[in-house]
């Protein structure tokens, strides 16, 4: 519903969306070029096939009652109880997969950023937790690729200041409004 209100048209063909298995444990992995909109688009595409999905997302995004049931909070490393919260996240994720559900995640755990001032945005290495889920869950894995990257201003702001970068987050969401997007869904 939010995608429709934002005017974001998903141009992924039906035959690619059909690659999402309708039943059984599933992990959907994707690059993360844009931020919040990536997760919203993935949720919309998966929801066209099945509604038993949960998205691993930063804990600050989980306090919205309308979407909270679809979220599993990922703690920030600097949080006082990050280790305990991380274990809870892992347990909740594995329980959901054992129950035959879908987990949507961004393996790098953060939005793609440029390594230098002017280079292209690149994904960070997958975090250890992602490797463990993929290996130990026995779930089917479906890869998704989003083309594009955030604005150069955002990528430069990331080099200068966390506050400046965070201040531009809404601008980056606004750049996605009323535009088509064409994620590519790979074979399981």
Where are the model-predicted features located?
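Membrane-anchoring hydrophobic helices of lipid-metabolizing enzymes
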Residues: 1-29, 39-41, 48-52, 68-69, ...
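Short, flexible loop segments at the rims of nucleotide/cofactor-binding pockets, characterized by
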Residues: 3-8, 32, 79-84, 119-120
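Hydrophobic beta-strand scaffold residues
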Residues: 10, 53-55, 103, 141
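Generic beta-sheet signal
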Residues: 24-30, 101-107, 139
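Short, basic, glycine/proline-bearing loop/turn elements
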Residues: 29-31, 71-80, 114-117
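Gly/Ser/Thr-rich loops at beta-strand to alpha-helix junctions
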Residues: 32-36, 111-112
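Conserved nucleotide-cofactor-binding alpha/beta core module
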Residues: 47, 53-86, 90-93, 97
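A cross-family acyltransferase "interaction/gating" segment
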Residues: 102, 110-188
């Amino acid at each position: 519903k939010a995608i429709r209100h934002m005017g974001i048209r998903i141009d992924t063909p039906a035959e690619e969306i059909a690659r999402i298995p309708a039943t059984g444990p599933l992990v959907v992995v994707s690059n993360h070029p844009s931020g919040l909109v990536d997760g919203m688009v993935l949720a919309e595409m998966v929801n066209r096939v099945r509604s038993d999905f949960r998205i691993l997302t930063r804990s600050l995004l989980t306090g919205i009652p309308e979407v909270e049931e679809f979220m599993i909070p990922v703690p920030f490393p600097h949080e006082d109880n990050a280790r305990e919260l991380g274990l809870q996240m892992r347990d909740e994720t594995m329980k959901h997969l054992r129950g035959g559900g879908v987990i949507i995640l961004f393996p790098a755990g953060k939005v793609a950023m440029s390594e230098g001032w002017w280079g292209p945005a690149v994904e960070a290495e997958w975090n250890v937790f992602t490797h463990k889920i993929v290996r130990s869950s026995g779930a089917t894995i479906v890869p998704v690729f989003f083309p594009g990257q955030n604005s150069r201003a955002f990528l430069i702001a990331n080099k200068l200041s966390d506050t400046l970068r965070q201040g531009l987050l809404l601008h980056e969401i606004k750049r996605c409004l009323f535009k088509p997007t064409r994620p590519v869904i790979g074979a399981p």
